[in-house]
């Protein structure tokens, strides 16, 4: 899958997720953001959610929601209150990734 197709798949996925959850932000990060992807690379998508008490349940649900999209999508959920530059993983996403639009 090329970068344009990966971005389209990730954007469609985020649009579907936003129908079920209140999203604060969403980002593509990892190999597609850094332009070092391969044909079999996964599409890392950070999903920043509002008002989520149990991230484990959300993670499972996010994996199920991707069945209508490309299975290469690898969702990474975050609470909006935890998504800040003090976390090295979040800092990497913010520095190397790029933000996806959230459907309103």
Task: Give the label of every model feature segment.
Residues 1-25, 34-39, 50-104:
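Catalytic core of pol beta-like nucleotidyltransferases
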Residues 29-31:
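Glycine-rich beta-strand-to-loop/alpha-helix junction loops that act as flexible
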Residues 41-43:
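Short, conserved active-site loops that position catalytic residues or coordinate cofactors/metal ions
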Residues 46-48:
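Short hydrophobic/aromatic beta-strand micro-patches
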């Amino acid at each position: 899958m090329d970068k344009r197709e990966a971005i389209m798949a990730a954007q469609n996925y985020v649009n579907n997720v936003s129908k079920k959850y209140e999203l604060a932000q969403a980002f593509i990060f990892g190999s597609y953001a850094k332009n070092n992807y391969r044909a079999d690379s996964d599409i890392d998508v950070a999903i920043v959610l509002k008002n989520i008490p149990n991230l484990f349940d959300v993670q499972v649900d996010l994996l199920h929601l991707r069945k209508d999209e490309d299975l290469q999508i690898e969702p990474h959920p975050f609470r909006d209150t935890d998504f800040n530059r003090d976390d090295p993983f979040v800092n990497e996403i913010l520095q190397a990734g790029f933000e996806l639009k959230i459907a309103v």
